[in-house]
């Protein structure tokens, strides 16, 4: 059975590893794309929108809904990537915890 000092050291080690993983995620750029890459967005891992690029060919004043859908798709694509990487990197730290 581990003593208290050993458990504290292990907890500190896990905390440091988790912090490093969080920093890696925050420093990663995630690119989301709509169909045919007509709209692209870049997010940092902390979910800050860094850029939004729209192909001029899809800008149609008569049909703003299509552009809105493409922007939504690109944003959701990037956020989904962030969520997936976050789960991969940080999920190992929370598995088995009672919350």
Curated annotation (Swiss-Prot):
Coiled coil: none
Predominant place of localization: cytoplasm
Cystines in this chain: none
Family matches, as Gene3D superfamilies: Nucleoid-associated protein YbaB-like domain
HAMAP family in UniProt: DNA_YbaB_EbfC (MF_00274)
Similarity field: Belongs to the YbaB/EbfC family.
Identification of the protein by name: Nucleoid-associated protein llmg_0128
Protein's organism: Lactococcus lactis subsp. cremoris (strain MG1363)
